[in-house]
Amino acid sequence: MSTPKTYYFYLWRHRFVDDVTDKIIARTCFGITSNPPNRIHGYEGHVGHVVKFAKLWTGSERLIRELETRIKSDFFQHTVVGTDGFRYEWIDESVSFESIVGWVNWEIENTFIGITEVKEVK
């Protein structure tokens, strides 16, 4: 019998200069992975600099996938829409990072018991 694969839910804060307004914008990316280092390498390849997850939680694949589904639903109106109306796993700058972390912590404490925070994010 194989042991279940550990999954992770992450938040990553990304700041960039908007090409239209020339203002600095901070958005929160969210997602899941079974291999945080590989996921980080993927982001670094896209953005061209070192990436570090701001928050990372771990749990069973089922719980982590359900948490991701919940955040997509609850924050749907705040997800970033790109070319051709494609929605990304980015929460726009109208929602503070602290609010998102508070939401995740509440969901874990009240709905997704079994998910734990990774205290040292590498």
What are the roles of these predicted feature ranges?
Residues 1-122:
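Non-catalytic accessory segments flanking enzymatic or RNA/DNA-binding domains
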